[in-house]
């Protein structure tokens, strides 16, 4: 497609005329050439957000277009010299025209004169243990997608026996540490970090990954978004902690296509996180130097990434980069699922011994409650969560509703301190504290598995109602004491409290669907929306027989109610309920 008239106006610096000329193309078919021209015009007219939109659209068509990264650098120069420099570095990587390379280099050098400029090269630390083909694919993907000047490879081999070590020894572009025994993940990573250039940022990367175009570029852009960001992490197809994409695709090739299309400029790309999974975690060198290396008590591996992030939370913040996708097979380093589960159990206990709490208990994002928020994503909602843990649910709300203002109350002091590092979280006991907010403030108050811990749930509901706007909602979840596992045990004379679950030893109150509805009714509220989650664990044969007999008793509760694990619901004041 030709744009001769538009190009001529740009060459003449006739920007207003160019803007009018551009109008005839805006609703037609786009390509990356038009995106370059449009972004150039918008930039010249001072419409930087319009320029950004055009750049993002152009990179959808051609992620290798160096002119778009040059324009993206111009966009960031106004606000962040480090991110601008990274864009110019990426433009150089994709540019083969020598004249244009000189221009881009001049941009880089100019930005480097800024006193605030401080960008470090990345040392990519990879551990290998057999799986030769996978190792070759991982390392090859880095070579194929990253500017050679932007990184160094540091590979730690944990005594491979399948030819991996011999192949690594033939490579000329990496630092190799060769162990005579398998030292595990934390110790191996520490060896790699120590072998890296001392000023470099560190990317811990699993060997069962495929790096896609711009995966690491956007991790670095996220890391330098703010000075206090100490670590960034990627999205993937196989990962926990809210880092897995929702799309279910057929295989690796489809994920490569999907991920490549994701790795472009994105509005609201960064989500605040309490911790990041270590399969692909980029660490700012200054932050790592402050908090120290991975804790080798977690060898052979699992939970060392959570531990590192807890230490980072004492002064640094973490971000999940939604526009950085890395394919993850999820079974590298020679682990199988049984060994993984056994190791995770052992290292989780070590984590509890070190920190005094179970991290998974306090960092779970309650997406089923978030799904009950009905306001448009551009709304300026106010949300309070009581019993917010480290703030995972609040952080995800703040990501999904960028204009939202979220606040939390957490009873555990050490947990509240972690969350307060990146969100408005206050420590306090909701049953005794003065709530530090104005009345009639919140659109939503969240009580996720809280009421069962209270001495007087109805008094607290009445207390919280005054902080809720007149026509807005409480979002709540409670475990179901009528669950078949609990009832079958009771009928056999058993009642054993647990560390977590329906019979959590800290529970003071128990609810059925009917009883929790009545609690809210007595507080002048009506449950307007309810859903249930069901347990999938099979009963033993004796319990199954007992429950089947119970179901036959006249006037017994509906059979389905015994299968419910938890109720999740939304409630409003009765006078405002529709």
Report residues per predicted region.
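Conserved donor NDP-sugar-binding/catalytic core segment of glycosyltransferases
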Residues: 210-249, 480
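S-adenosyl-L-methionine-dependent methyltransferase catalytic module, highlighting the catalytic core
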Residues: 243-244, 267, 296, 455-577
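A recurrent flexible, glycine/aromatic-enriched loop bordering the glycosyltransferase active site
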Residues: 252, 260-286, 501
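Conserved N-terminal segment of class I S-adenosyl-L-methionine
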Residues: 137, 333-440, 444, 458-461, ...
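Glycine-rich, basic loop-to-helix element that forms the pyrophosphate-binding segment
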Residues: 178-196
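A conserved acidic beta->alpha catalytic loop
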Residues: 157-166, 181, 388
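N-proximal low-complexity "stem/linker" segments adjacent to membrane-targeting elements
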Residues: 89, 93-141
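Short, acidic, metal-binding catalytic loop of nucleotide-sugar glycosyltransferases
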Residues: 140-150
């Amino acid at each position: 497609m030709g744009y001769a008239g538009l190009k001529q106006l740009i060459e003449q610096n006739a920007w207003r005329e160019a803007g009018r000329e551009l109008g005839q193309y805006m609703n037609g078919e786009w390509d990356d050439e038009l995106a370059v021209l449009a972004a150039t015009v918008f930039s010249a007219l001072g419409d930087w957000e319009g320029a950004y939109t055009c750049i993002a659209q152009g990179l959808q068509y051609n992620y290798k277009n160096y002119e778009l990264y040059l324009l993206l650098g111009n966009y960031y120069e106004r606000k962040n010299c480090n991110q601008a420099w990274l864009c110019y570095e990426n433009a150089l990587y994709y540019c083969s025209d020598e004249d244009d390379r000189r221009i881009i280099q001049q941009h880089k050098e100019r930005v480097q004169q800024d006193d605030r400029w401080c960008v470090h090269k990345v040392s990519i630390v990879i551990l290998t243990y057999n799986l030769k083909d996978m190792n070759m694919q991982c390392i090859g993907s880095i070579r194929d997608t990253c500017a050679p000047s932007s990184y160094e490879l540091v590979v730690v081999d944990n005594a491979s026996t399948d030819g991996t070590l011999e192949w690594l020894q033939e490579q000329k572009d990496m630092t190799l540490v060769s162990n005579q025994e398998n030292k595990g993940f934390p110790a191996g990573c520490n060896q790699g970090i120590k072998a890296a250039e001392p000023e470099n940022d560190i990317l811990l990367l699993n060997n069962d990954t495929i790096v896609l175009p711009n995966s690491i570029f956007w991790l670095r852009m996220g890391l330098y978004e703010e000075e206090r960001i100490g670590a960034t992490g990627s999205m993937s197809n196989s990962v926990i902690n809210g880092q897995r994409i929702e799309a279910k695709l057929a295989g690796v090739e489809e994920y490569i296509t999907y991920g490549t299309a994701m790795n472009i400029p994105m509005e609201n790309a960064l989500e605040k996180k309490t911790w990041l999974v270590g399969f692909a975690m980029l660490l700012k060198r200054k932050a790592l130097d402050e908090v120290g290396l991975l804790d080798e008590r977690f060898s052979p591996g699992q939970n060392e990434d959570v531990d590192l992030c807890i230490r980072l939370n004492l002064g640094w913040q973490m971000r999940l980069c939604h526009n950085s996708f890395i394919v993850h097979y999820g079974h590298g380093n020679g682990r199988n699922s049984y060994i993984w589960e056994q190791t995770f159990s052992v290292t989780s206990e070590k984590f509890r011994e070190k920190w005094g709490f179970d991290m998974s208990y306090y960092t779970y994002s309650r997406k089923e409650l978030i799904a009950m928020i009905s306001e448009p994503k551009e709304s300026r909602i106010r949300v309070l969560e009581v019993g917010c843990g480290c703030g995972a649910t609040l952080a995800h709300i703040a990501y999904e509703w960028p204009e939202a203002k979220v606040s939390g109350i957490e009873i555990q002091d050490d947990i509240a301190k972690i969350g307060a590092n990146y969100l408005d979280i206050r420590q306090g006991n909701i049953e005794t504290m003065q709530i530090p907010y104005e009345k009639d403030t919140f659109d939503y108050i969240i009580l996720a598995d809280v009421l069962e811990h209270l001495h007087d749930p109805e008094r607290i509901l009445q207390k919280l109602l005054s902080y809720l706007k007149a026509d807005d909602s409480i979002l709540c979840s409670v475990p179901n004491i009528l669950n078949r596992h609990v009832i079958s045990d009771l009928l056999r004379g058993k009642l054993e409290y647990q560390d977590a679950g329906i019979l959590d030893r800290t529970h003071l109150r128990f609810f059925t669907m009917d009883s929790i509805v009545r609690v809210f009714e007595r507080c002048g509220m009506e449950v307007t929306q309810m859903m249930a989650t069901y347990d999938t664990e099979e009963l033993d044969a004796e319990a199954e027989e007992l429950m089947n007999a119970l179901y036959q008793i006249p006037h017994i509760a509906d059979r389905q109610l015994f299968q419910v694990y938890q109720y999740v619901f939304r409630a409003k004041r009765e006078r405002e309920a529709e």
